Amino acid sequence: MILGEIMEVLAFKNQSLIDHVNDMVKYWERIKYRYLKTIKRALEALNIKLDIEKVDEFMKILIKLHDIGKASKIYQRAIINDQEKLMGFRHELVSAYYTYHILLKKFGDKNLAFIGALTVMLHHEPIIMGQIRNLKKKELTAEVVLDKLKKFDGMIEDFEDLIKKLIGYSIGDIIKNDSNKDDIIRFVIEMSVRARHTPNSEKLRFIVGTLLLPLVMCDYKGAESREGKAPKFAEVLEVESYVI
């Protein structure tokens, strides 16, 4: 389902979050039959069994929520006003927090929610890992998480309405509407530790990699209508979508 206009929450300076999500969903509808069975088999590696319709629903939730962290006050201030700075803030860490809780509510499976949230958290992996290396760290440590979220000061006033339009749930029925920064920091640190030290870490990386390809493809395709220079990944996108 393509979403109607809600409010002017921006994903990019020249594209609203809703328009970005709509374009991503449209592109997913074009390519999904190439990926649904592969994703289904990948999830089965961790004994997560979903039928094709549920896999489709799962992926659409990732698409709709992957940038929900951009509905944070700090991000909207920075994108509207060039004088405002993000100060290292990474929206995907906030997106992962909400994605986990919404997936858990929707599917009732902690492992599936974790995988989905981790995928969302890593959908800009080259950026965040590059920033970590600049801090002379090798991984998403507590210190790094604190640095990336230190300026986070909550979500926009109409966040609950935005979530309800995107996924049909009231966020107040799932978690606190204006989650405490400490809650998000604690969650991201726990995710990072679990991802590195789980006994099934190799399977986990395989599954997340399987999910990241179509998610990132849709993300870049969904940004095509914005003004500005096309991202380099667009070259990969053209190869992947050539026969569609």
Curated annotation (Swiss-Prot):
Changing residue 123 to A: Very little nuclease activity. Optimum pH is 7-9, varying somewhat depending on the substrate. The gene is cas3. The keyword Metal-binding applies. It comes from the Archaea. InterPro entries: CRISPR-assoc_Cas3_HD, CRISPR-assoc_Cas3_HD_sf. One of its GO terms (molecular function) is metal ion binding. Changing residue 20 to A: Loss of all nuclease activity. Keywords: Antiviral defense, Endonuclease, Exonuclease, Hydrolase, Magnesium, Metal-binding, Nuclease. One of its GO terms (biological process) is defense response to virus. It comes from Methanocaldococcus jannaschii (strain ATCC 43067 / DSM 2661 / JAL-1 / JCM 10045 / NBRC 100440). CRISPR (clustered regularly interspaced short palindromic repeat), is an adaptive immune system that provides protection against mobile genetic elements (viruses, transposable elements and conjugative plasmids). CRISPR clusters contain sequences complementary to antecedent mobile elements and target invading nucleic acids. CRISPR clusters are transcribed and processed into CRISPR RNA (crRNA). Cas3 plus Cascade participate in CRISPR interference, the third stage of CRISPR immunity. Monomer. This is CRISPR-associated endonuclease Cas3-HD. Its EC number is 3.1.-.-.
